[in-house]
């Protein structure tokens, strides 16, 4: 298998780790990042010598709270410009439901699949190879090919959910929102603990 990685932050680096010889995998890996210090290959090399392209770039919030997809759009435009082969592009950035379909319509020559990440920055490598499920959203044929990639790498140890763009994107948002809700809940409970004089560490031990 030939794996291309665009965006070598902690998410892209986790993909590189998971498919590297360090984990017993023999995939051929090429890496591009806009930061020359992180880039190993050119974007042309990564795009045209890969079966699967993992795109992991930022989607920061705009001042009004909406998601800014400019970086994703820019990279997809670059891929579209240099593409000579037809790799599957796996989008891993957080996006509102409907975003992947819009990009697929804007760049019909690309094979786009939404494959959200569920990683924490400090343990991203471990999280990637031990995650509870893989989510794949998009065209059925492309999704099946991505499933084959993950089965090739992980066997049947990790469940794979195959669905459409919108459902995959919603799953990612649900996960993010639920995590935020848990953090908010625990922060509130800590305030209650401090106010009533409870032993917070013991409360945590008993709760978890």
Where are the regions a protein language model picked out?
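Gly/Ser/Thr-rich loops at beta-strand to alpha-helix junctions
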Residues: 11, 94-98, 179
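Rossmann-like NAD(P)(H) cofactor-binding subdomain of soluble oxidoreductases
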Residues: 52, 60-124
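Short conserved AdoMet
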Residues: 24, 48, 83-84, 155
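Structural motif
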Residues: 33-34, 54-56, 92-94, 135, 137-140
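NAD(P)+-binding Rossmann beta1-loop-alpha1 motif at the extreme N-terminus of oxidoreductases
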Residues: 1-48, 52
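Short, charged/polar "capping" segments at the starts of alpha-helices
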Residues: 37-41, 97-101, 141-145
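Internal alpha-helical scaffold of NAD(P)-dependent oxidoreductase catalytic cores
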Residues: 25, 104-113, 124-208
């Amino acid at each position: 298998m030939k794996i291309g990685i665009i965006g070598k932050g902690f998410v892209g680096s986790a993909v590189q780790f998971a498919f590297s010889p360090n984990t017993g995998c023999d995939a051929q890996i090429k890496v591009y990042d806009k930061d020359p210090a992180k880039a190993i290959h050119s974007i042309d090399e990564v795009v045209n010598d890969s079966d699967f392209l993992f795109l992991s770039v930022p989607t920061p919030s705009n001042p009004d709270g909406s998601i800014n997809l400019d970086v994703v759009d820019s990279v997809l435009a670059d891929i579209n410009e240099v593409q000579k082969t037809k790799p599957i592009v796996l989008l891993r950035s957080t996006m509102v439901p409907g975003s992947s379909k819009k990009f697929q319509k804007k760049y019909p020559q690309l094979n786009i699949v939404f494959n959200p990440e569920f990683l924490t920055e400090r343990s991203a490598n471990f999280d990637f190879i031990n995650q509870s499920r893989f989510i794949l959203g998009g065209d059925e044929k492309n999704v099946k090919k991505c499933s084959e990639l993950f089965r090739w790498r992980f066997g049947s140890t990790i469940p794979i959910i195959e669905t459409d763009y919108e459902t995959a994107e919603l799953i990612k948002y649900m996960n993010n929102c639920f995590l935020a809700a848990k953090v908010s809940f625990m922060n509130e409970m800590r305030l209650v603990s401090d106010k009533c004089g409870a032993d917070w560490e013991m409360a945590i031990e008993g709760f978890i």
